[in-house]
Curated annotation (Swiss-Prot):
Residue span(s) of domain HTH gntR-type: 27-95
Descriptive protein name: HTH-type transcriptional repressor NanR
Annotated GO biological process: negative regulation of DNA-templated transcription
Stated family: Belongs to the NanR family.
InterPro entries: GntR_C, TF_FadR/GntR_C, Tscrpt_reg_HTH_GntR, Tscrpt_reg_NanR, WH-like_DNA-bd_sf, WH_DNA-bd_sf
GO function term, MF aspect, one: DNA-binding transcription factor activity
DNA-binding region: 55-74
Gene3D superfamilies to which the protein is assigned, alphabetical: GntR ligand-binding domain-like (1.20.120.530), Winged helix-like DNA-binding domain superfamily/Winged helix DNA-binding domain (1.10.10.10)
């Protein structure tokens, strides 16, 4: 390492002021272990799918305690660089779209509990799926349209069972998200619906039944527009559907508050 040439600085006073502005922070042992392991993985000293050394071996190699090793491995897992299963050594992996979106899950659920949080996420879903249906109407293949039709048929068969209908509803929108063939879109779609469904109030089966029938009819309109390759009509049908879903669940939420 090249020594610092103090003459190259304006003065030692400048250096002093600079250090006062940016105090040095001491790194935790676990952070240093994490950084070194990350570099080893990126240099491919450990190949994808290969197991890392055991915790004890890592402790000896880095001369640190077990907590530091475990914290480092947990941090690498959050980055998607390793997978950790109970009773097994950590295995090298590569970040996926699910890993990236999964990191946001806790923050997203906290945000949903804030005033206006659900509305903001519903708007995000509307903007996102609006683009999906327009793309589907323009570019969906016959096979992809057939997949939508099959999802619609399962939707119809599930109308009398609320739990099954919710599952078939999610699957219908998942097929839409699959059409562009982008794994990031799929990860966003799955996460968005998981977050929004988890934030919904509990509603009786009788109240949900009519809502299910309305949603099903709206799904038909979306598929019909996609089959005709009409992106404007597909977008209108999708927006009508999601605005209706939002209004219904907001009404359910207000009703559950009054009952309390």
């Amino acid at each position: 390492m090249k020594p610092i040439d103090l003459q190259a600085e304006n003065s030692t006073e400048t250096v002093g002021r600079s250090l006062r502005r940016r105090p040095l922070a001491r790194k935790k042992l676990s952070d240093m272990v994490e950084e070194e392991l990350e570099q080893m993985i990126r240099r491919q000293e450990f190949a994808q799918g290969e197991q890392l050394p055991s915790e004890r071996e890592l402790m000896e190699f880095f001369n640190v305690g077990r907590p530091s090793v475990r914290e480092a491995l947990a941090a690498l897992k959050r980055k998607g660089l390793v997978q950790i299963n109970n009773g097994e050594r950590a295995r090298v992996s590569m970040p996926s779209a699910d890993t990236i979106i999964g990191e946001l899950s806790g923050m997203a659920k906290d945000f949903l509990t804030q005033p206006g949080g659900i509305t903001h996420f519903e708007q995000l879903r509307l903007f996102f799926e609006s683009s999906l249906v327009r793309y589907a109407a323009e570019f969906a293949t016959d096979e992809q349209v057939e997949s939508l039709s099959k999802a619609l048929e399962i939707n119809s068969q599930s109308l009398s069972d609320n739990a099954l209908f919710i599952r078939s509803d999610v699957d219908f929108h998942r097929v839409l998200a699959e059409i562009p063939g982008n794994p990031i879109f799929m990860a966003i779609h799955v996460a968005l619906l998981d977050w929004l469904i988890a934030a919904r109030p509990k509603v009786s089966d009788a109240e949900l039944y009519e809502h299910n029938n309305v949603s099903y009819r709206q799904h038909i309109a979306i598929v019909d527009a996609i089959r005709r390759h009409d992106p404007d009509e597909a977008d209108r049908a999708l927006q009508s559907h999601l605005n209706s879903v939002s209004a219904t669940w907001h009404a359910f939420g207000q009703g559950s508050k009054k009952k309390k």
